[in-house]
């Protein structure tokens, strides 16, 4: 057992010395001579995008003598859905990868998360209820063009001495154990097929999750969280901070001093939400995520037409997208978003990023998840290359990942789509979810990147306590949403309200004030709806419930 910052972290005793010696993992050091290096490469990374390139960068910075091969399928990274980061990923990019200059010069700084609600009384966009910050955020967060970021990171990895094979297709691989792995891949330019040996294989193949599917450890979470997404890009979008946008938002335009257009704007509804992310190109990434138990988006037309039809049913969406044009052949659809793997590491291999699993994009924590998995793999490999036995660490990492995944899911996302369309409930959830995020994960990674990125969130005694508290209020909010449906008051506060955050969330215990405020709103709702039965089988439309809209609401 090792004590770091008065925090108890349980690691195998034979790795304790290495942890104490690697408080700064970026300090270059020699490889141990205690292992066989007769393989062709010390490490082969399958996938050269964010997770694969990041892992290679961190390993080469610490062990410059490592022979690393990165196999990337594409000749050039394609345009991907625009991504928004939250504060943990912002810390990873700026303080761990140390690409802050690139992020600030090539991507858009994010002005927080902003949610927009409406009901049948919302006759103008300016009457839409808004949840979000009144000022700019204090910590670095970004609206990311993934094609640009992935390209930059792979170039950095190559400049550090990593060999890159692209475009190349992985034909097969054999997980023979540490120092006994083989992988066969084909160059798509010369047509040459190569088989190489590797000390370790890193799976950074994203949702393809090659190792998990090969080992049959990939698991869908569709039985508990049947969400899907479709998205596209639009040009000629009316920004909320433009002259036309400000005029349309008359009545609320002066209440926010930050630029709304640089927030990640979410349009909210029962069983669904839409993201709106500005990109450096001037285009806008737009998508919808929905719970198929509750909602189905419009069915007719192309994907872009279906998405635009839905957007125009929301007053704020209509302002922004009425004259917008979809970018041709630039849309995607994913069914059953949530999945996980029983194993994230083993004898001579490790998975990172989306190859480990994915939950939900609502709070933009996808790269948080990637950051922790990348750093966990780094910690494992640096122990190995420093000469320590990692058998017990492998067992620990697999246990930690699974428990963290479900603690995280139950705390934030289980059945949450029941109350996404109610501004009053989401106001309480916003304060509680983000308040606990700053008190826990954000505070910890800004205090000690090395130990905290190594650990998965919501794990350990304190993490479990917060996860249980969050899962409890999440369950209560689901029940309260059903009670509101019965009472005919679901969405009653979706017009003419401004739930603005006028004091910043800070990565310290001062953010408890937001948690306390959220609890007060919650308890008032419990008292008001104490004797109201919860709806069971179906939405019961009322004047205040925004039904119908584009798409179809389903029996729940």
Segments (PLM) and residue ranges:
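C-terminal helical "tail/cap" subdomain of flavin- and related membrane-associated enzymes
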Residues: 379-556
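Glycine-rich FAD pyrophosphate-binding loop
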Residues: 60-81
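Short beta-strand to alpha-helix junction loop
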Residues: 135-155, 297-299
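N-terminal Rossmann-fold NAD(P) dinucleotide-binding loop
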Residues: 52
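N-terminal FAD cofactor-binding segment of flavoenzymes
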Residues: 78-121
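Predominantly flavin-linked oxidoreductase catalytic cores and closely associated redox partners
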Residues: 160-308
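Beta1/beta-strand and adjacent pyrophosphate-binding region of the FAD-binding site
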Residues: 37-49
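FAD/FMN-dependent oxidoreductases across multiple families
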Residues: 270-272, 278-280, 292-413
């Amino acid at each position: 057992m090792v004590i770091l910052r008065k925090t108890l972290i349980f690691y195998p005793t034979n790795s304790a010395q290495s942890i104490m010696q690697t408080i700064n993992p970026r300090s270059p050091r020699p490889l141990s001579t205690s292992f066989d290096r007769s393989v062709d490469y010390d490490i082969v990374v399958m996938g050269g995008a964010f997770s694969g390139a990041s892992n290679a960068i961190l390993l080469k910075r610490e062990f410059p003598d490592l022979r690393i091969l990165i196999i990337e399928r594409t000749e050039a990274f394609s345009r991907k859905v625009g991504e928004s980061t939250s504060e943990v990923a912002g810390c990873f990019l700026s303080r761990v990868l140390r690409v802050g200059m690139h992020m600030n010069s090539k991507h858009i700084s994010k002005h927080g998360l902003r949610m927009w609600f409406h009901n049948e009384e919302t006759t103008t966009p300016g009457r839409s209820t808004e949840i979000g910050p009144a000022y700019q955020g204090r910590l670095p967060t970004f609206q990311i063009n993934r094609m640009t970021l992935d390209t930059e990171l792979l170039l950095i990895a190559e400049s550090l001495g990593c060999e890159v094979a692209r475009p190349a297709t992985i034909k097969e691989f054999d997980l023979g154990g540490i120092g006994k792995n083989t992988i066969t891949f084909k160059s798509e330019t010369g047509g040459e097929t190569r088989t190489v040996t590797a000390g370790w294989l890193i799976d950074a193949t994203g949702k393809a999750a090659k190792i998990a599917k090969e080992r049959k450890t990939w698991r869908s979470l569709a039985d508990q969280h049947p969400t899907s997404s479709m998205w596209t890009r639009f040009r000629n979008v009316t920004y909320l901070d433009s002259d036309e946008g400000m005029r349309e938002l008359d009545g609320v335009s002066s209440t926010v001093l930050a630029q709304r257009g640089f927030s990640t704007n979410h349009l909210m509804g029962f069983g669904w939400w839409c993201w709106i992310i500005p990109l450096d190109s001037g285009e806008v990434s737009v998508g919808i995520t929905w719970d198929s138990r509750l909602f189905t988006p419009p069915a007719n037309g192309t994907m872009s037409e279906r998405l635009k039809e839905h957007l125009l049913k929301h007053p704020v969406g209509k302002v922004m997208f009425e004259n917008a044009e979809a970018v041709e052949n630039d849309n995607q659809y994913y069914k059953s978003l949530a999945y996980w793997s029983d194993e994230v590491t083993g004898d001579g291999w490790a998975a990172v990023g989306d190859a480990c699993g994915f939950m939900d994009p609502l709070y933009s924590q996808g790269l948080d998840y990637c950051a922790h998995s990348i750093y966990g793999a780094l910690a494992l490999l640096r122990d190995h290359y420093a000469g320590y036995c990692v058998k017990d660490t492998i067992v620990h990492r697999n246990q930690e990942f699974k428990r963290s995944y479900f603690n995280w899911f139950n705390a934030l996302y289980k059945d949450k789509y029941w109350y996404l369309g109610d501004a009053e409930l989401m106001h309480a959830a916003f304060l509680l979810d983000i308040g606990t995020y700053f008190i826990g994960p954000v505070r910890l990674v800004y205090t000690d990147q090395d130990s905290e990125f190594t650990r998965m969130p919501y794990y350990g005694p304190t993490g479990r306590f917060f996860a249980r508290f969050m899962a409890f209020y999440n369950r209560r909010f689901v029940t309260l949403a059903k009670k509101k449906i019965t009472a005919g008051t679901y969405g009653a506060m979706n017009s003419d309200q401004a739930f603005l955050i006028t004091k910043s969330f800070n990565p310290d215990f001062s953010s408890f004030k937001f948690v306390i405020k959220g609890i007060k709103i919650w308890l008032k709702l419990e008292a008001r709806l104490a004797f109201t039965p919860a709806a069971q089988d179906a939405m019961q439309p009322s004047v205040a419930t925004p039904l119908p809209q584009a798409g179809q609401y389903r029996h729940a």
